Amino acid sequence: WGTPDILGYNRSGNFFTIELKVTKTNKVRLSPHQIAFHVKHPNNTFILVKALSLNSIKLYEGKVIKELDACGLKLEPHSLGLESCFQMLESL
């Protein structure tokens, strides 16, 4: 309820959060609490989605959570693939 799945720091000491999601469809199921958290905390917050149907991992910034809720995986991710996600988080 209200706390993302991962609370982390990168090597530069920058704090970030990640909400983890898995979906079989294009829809990403987000609770009202998860949406509210990312609306209130739009910076250095992320949603990492494992799309089973596409066998891919997509990373979205918290500031686009309303669009992610409305559009699902049709929304362009900030990073695509695990290595790209790691690189982006390390660059914060």
Which sequence ranges carry the predicted segments?
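Beta-rich catalytic cores
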Residues: 2
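Active-site donor-binding loop signature of nucleotide-sugar glycosyltransferases
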Residues: 20-22, 62, 70
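Short, exposed beta-strand "edge-strand" segments with a Pro/Gly-rich flavor and a Y/T-containing core
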Residues: 24-29, 53-60, 77-79
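Charged phosphate-binding loop/patch that engages nucleotide di/tri-phosphates or the phosphate backbone
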Residues: 72-92
